[in-house]
Amino acid sequence: MAIFDIEKDELLRLSDIQLEELIARLAEAEVAMHGHSPACVNWSGSITAPDGGIDIHVQVPIDQLKAGFLVRPDTVFQAKKHKMPKSAIEREIGTGKALSPIISEQARKQGSYIIVSLGDDCSPSGKKDRLKAMRDAVKDDPNESYLHLDFYDRSKLIQWLRQHPSVMLWVKAKLGQGYSGWQPYGAWSNPPQGVIDTLISAPGVTITLPSGKGQKLKIDEAINPMRALIRSTNKAVRITGLSGVGKTRIVQALFDETVGTDALDRTVAIYVDTGYEPVPSATAMLDNLLAEGRRAIMILDNCPSELHASLASKVSAAGKEVSLITIEYDIRDDKPQTTEVIHIETDGPDVAEQLLIRRFPSIGQNNARRIAEFADGNARVALAIAERVEEGESLALLSDAQLFNRLFEQRNHPDGHLRE
């Protein structure tokens, strides 16, 4: 089976809420493919939340969409795990004077109403019968001729899913078939569960872009130029910097609509840490994306120079359908004809200090500042020391050598193996 494929009957194992989320993710990807924000898609995320008959609501601020899985810019999806014969359709949307207000409103707005039935896998005549049942149910509405109706069965849903590799990664993971290491957009920097993970853009980290003539930008100044570079270039983009400067978190922010403006399309993001030997390999994944002509942004964390060089040449030759972002601690011999290099480095303790206060609120401002300054702004070193600070302890009187030794302590006991 191809990497981005799945047997349609496997979808039957999705729960109600997973089905709803799948449709929402597909709608987000479809909207983004048309050049609009995924934020145009709203869904409750809970089958128990009152929704008034709406599971997923798409509202794109334009008059018309190009033909595809979304036909009208205002579309309501109703997700159903069970089969939907004529009788079930009539119960769902009502008839005559009992017609659902949601349907009437969609008709008034010249919108679309689509039932997605996971339990159905219809023959052409079966789908025709269900569409007729939907049309008959709304025939008495004064605006019924303006309403677009459709019925998506399991085959239609799998056809839609095959168009969006990142959503395919998500659904395979939900079904326990996930590829080892590969992830859609998410918390790639792997913060502790339950911890606030908004981007810290305080002074203390600088970013140098290839076209910036060596100018060092603060994080909030660099986000939009980084996005513009990734959109415009047909070269691979290499993010370099020492371990602990926040490379992965900054790349994650490029897809975050709450950071800056005009975020990269998170619905096409495919991430992996190559240090964990992913299956399929990064080379196989890229080859598959290029062969199928899929739009994707591949992010390869901890990507060695040799692998980067191999993939960068393929991406550069193929055009802009697949964008490649790699992350690593140094540059080595990257070829400028196939690579744009963005360098990140620490420039003070501010970001590391704020991160410590966020992760260890009981550590106190003074301790956080002392650790961040000692770590020279390196977040990874600072976090490692902070983990070893006792409740109520003050670090003010500790020498640098004593702080350094904290890196080699396990539960208050020195660990010689770590030092070695």
Give residue spans per PLM region.
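P-loop NTPase Walker A phosphate-binding motif
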Residues: 58-65, 74-76, 90-101, 240-268, ...
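Conserved AAA+ ATPase "SRH/arginine-finger" region at the nucleotide-binding site
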Residues: 340-355
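A short hydrophobic beta-strand->loop->alpha-helix junction that borders the nucleotide-binding pocket
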Residues: 46, 79-80, 240-243, 268-278, ...
